[in-house]
Swiss-Prot record:
Transmembrane segments: none
Compositional bias (Polar residues): 410-430
Pfam families listed in its UniProt record: DUF1899, WD40, WD40_4
Subunit structure: Forms homooligomers, but does not form complexes with the other coronins. Interacts with Arp2/3 complex components, including ACTR2, ARPC1B and ARPC2. Binds actin.
Stretches forming WD repeats: 80-120, 130-170, 174-213, 217-260, 265-305
PTM-bearing positions, type Phosphoserine: 2
Modification comment: Phosphorylation on Ser-2 regulates the interaction with the Arp2/3 complex and cell motility in fibroblasts. Phosphorylation does not seem to affect subcellular location.
Biological process according to GO: actin filament branching; actin filament bundle assembly; cellular response to platelet-derived growth factor stimulus; endothelial cell chemotaxis; negative regulation of Arp2/3 complex-mediated actin nucleation; negative regulation of smooth muscle cell chemotaxis; positive regulation of lamellipodium morphogenesis; protein localization to cell leading edge
GN (gene name): Coro1b
Lineage: Eukaryota, Metazoa, Chordata, Craniata, Vertebrata
Keyword Cytoplasm assigned: yes
Keywords (A to Z) from UniProt: Actin-binding, Coiled coil, Cytoplasm, Cytoskeleton, Phosphoprotein, Repeat, WD repeat
Identification of the protein by name: Coronin-1B
Amino acid sequence: MSFRKVVRQSKFRHVFGQPVKNDQCYEDIRVSRVTWDSTFCAVNPKFLAVIVEASGGGAFMVLPLNKTGRIDKAYPTVCGHTGPVLDIDWCPHNDEVIASGSEDCTVMVWQIPENGLTSPLTEPVVVLEGHTKRVGIITWHPTARNVLLSAGCDNVVLIWNVGTAEELYRLDSLHPDLIYNVSWNHNGSLFCSACKDKSVRIIDPRRGTLVAEREKAHEGARPMRAIFLADGKVFTTGFSRMSERQLALWDPENLEEPMALQELDSSNGALLPFYDPDTSVVYVCGKGDSSIRYFEITDEPPYIHFLNTFTSKEPQRGMGSMPKRGLEVSKCEIARFYKLHERKCEPIVMTVPRKSDLFQDDLYPDTAGPEAALEAEDWVSGQDANPILISLREAYVPSKQRDLKVSRRNVLSDSRPASYSRSGASTATAVTDVPSGNLAGAGEAGKLEEVMQELRALRMLVKEQGERISRLEEQLGRMENGDT
């Protein structure tokens, strides 16, 4: 008889979240109070954008990532809308282009100066007018340049070519009620939507047809969300009939029953899912919650595997997620969230603890880069393409103190294996046998030679220690896999 392992093996089992220090937060930001279940925040490797309170119209703030600390009340904003801004989204193919949707029924696309704003930005690059009610959803196509989707409270989905300000597709008969959210699939050939009528729909935008539909995906009356995963499955969040918050996983080929359905708690805030296709981890943030739960999605039942919960004291008003190419890979950072408080934005770093200071190939497979795979015209003609991937290895920066850390650990460690003691002793000799008087009285050449001797000895220790770490990691890997 075979017994299932009590603890499921996962490289993400020990992922932990940690807020940054106070001086790395963005203070004194008046986050929008508008009633709308949006993230209110968008971030890319260059800029942080936050929807803020504004008198006489709608505005959002765009800050260079390094502009932390207290933000001056007179700091310039993007303020061209005549009504409150409801949603913002950075273009995945240009880190200086952002789109916004507003209660004034318009979509605007903005070009942010390379070094950030020095004066209020009131003139968008283009204004897209086609909705008759407020525009609450904005999302760029993942692979086609200049293709933007907007959805409004008029229950209409519009797809635009931003480069020509042209309306490409109008889908006005597929949603009988308010649209809660829209999510493109991996190559942008389909999108899924969650609607107030409790249905999840999968739609082919170019044909204007309904590919699949699941009624009452979640039976509760509160808002739900649906997102596409990289393998084509659909992940949803919502509420049960008893108002308990739920997660579910669906196969679009068969929407009769969910592949998995989990109940979380009975809080009333909408659950906002953030998905990382490289690691198959979904982070779930509830509006008004003070926690972030994260789950790994696999092909093995029960398919949705709880990993851990990051908990803080303050409730979140909104949340932004950094694209993978903006993370610090040298610190084994696999996600970074920008949590909105009432008057500040706090980055939260998700890290996989690793002892090795080398680039972690298993954590960082090639990821979607900033280059568009298609032009808008190609996509309209029926072409599809997956995102163009880039390696994050070039972004890896070894720790500047790596040699110092390793040498200290080896010189001071009493549990060092015998095979390393000779090298350690020779290093200690190289370091301690040089009389201080000689250093003081010797010429520059003598000083240089002594320093070089010490450096060579330390390098040898580093090399040997690195080999030992590699062997131990291999042994640990075999033990975890049950090979030994």
